[in-house]
Amino acid sequence: MTPKTAFDLIFRRAVTPAFATPVDIGVAGGRIAAIAPRLESEAREIHLDGKLVLPGFVDTHIHLDKACLLGRCGHHHGSVGEAIQAVAAMKRDFTVEDVYARGAKVLERAIVAGTTRMRTHVEIDPRIGLRGFEAIKALKRDYAWAIDLSLCVFPQEGLTNDPGAGELLVAALRDGGEAIGGCPYMDTDPMAHLEKLFDLAQAFDVDVDLHLDFDLDPSWWHLDEVCRQAERRNWQGRVAIGHATKLSALPPAEFDAAAIKLARAGVAVTVLPATDLYLMGRDATHNVPRGLTLAHKLVERGVVCSVATNNVQNPFTPFGDASLLRMANFYANVAQAGVGEFDACLDLVTSLPARLMNLRDYGIAPGNPADLIVLDTASGRGAIAELPDVLMGFKHGRQVFERQKAVLLRPG
């Protein structure tokens, strides 16, 4: 038992991944002030009775600017290229207000599903200019009370082959872009594309987060060049690649070799199950490959990995609700994860993506922000197995949502 301390809020009997038995979590000034088996205080109390508390989900890869487009473009887009073309045809007509409204819809779904940190890719090119960027900046400002939103500026349709794209990227980086993305497989000169992006990353001191190796042909890839750039520029721990579905097509020995290379270069991998599964293997007539890279197996080999949302209700992924818990469960199903691997699957949407984004103040520890969510289960394993409700969420100690449990109404 601890002496009485001035807290603003105490969570009683919370289960957390770091403690074997339930603990009390004391919050003061928007931060976690103490964790102990029993805290004495006259503060407001929330009795959790052994429910799981997490420091919120972390979504490392989503596209808020092109979410919720299905009603505008039809549903017949079977390949990556067709999806890119469909969105490119619409971008010229995007307005700041339109991007804001669609992005807000998805952002609110993510918040009530327990996401507290998010990196969104924002397309920057001569078609849309900086309109999407301005809209997402406004979302970052307007929803800061509930979620930390980080902007990764991103030339979807290439860089060296798209006059004016480079200048727009620089303008966005000068105006608040916090990471730089890229898509070398869409550029006529992929190596120059990567060179330019790393130049900009160094010039503006930002992380690199790429779309990479997004097919199932393992005979060629850009992974080697990304690792080389990361090591040559001492950018280890500041580079991530999304999709990387080619890794799913490798035999075991080559998969192991790729993992060693990624770990040595400090290059992280983000797997995007909904999109990767939806778009890969489209040419197969039977025995269709999953096209899903096994992130938890890469983690076992020393690679930092995450599972993320990517797209929501657009040609790349015509469904989605921005729930990272659902995505982690989906990943575990498709990856055929064993029960003993469920905790590792939960790590892919919590602690590991926090490492990928270099979030130094993430986690349930004294001094960190009181960004907490409560799940209707008693363990991390249960979170993956059961898909429990996320009952409530807090940002800097302030409650931002609550979900009422369903009540069964028996007859009589």
Task: Give, region by region, the residue ranges found by the protein language model.
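N-terminal metal-binding scaffold of metallo-dependent hydrolase/deaminase domains
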Residues: 1-41, 380
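Histidine-centered catalytic micro-motifs
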Residues: 56-67, 122, 207-216
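Active-site gating loops and adjacent loop-to-helix segments of metal-dependent hydrolytic enzymes
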Residues: 68-99, 171, 176, 204, ...
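Alpha-helical scaffold segments that flank or form the walls of functional sites
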Residues: 70-121, 127-142, 167-174
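His/Asp/Glu-enriched, well-ordered alpha-helical/loop segment
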Residues: 207, 228-239, 275-279, 289-377
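C-terminal cap of metal-dependent C-N hydrolases
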Residues: 355, 366-412
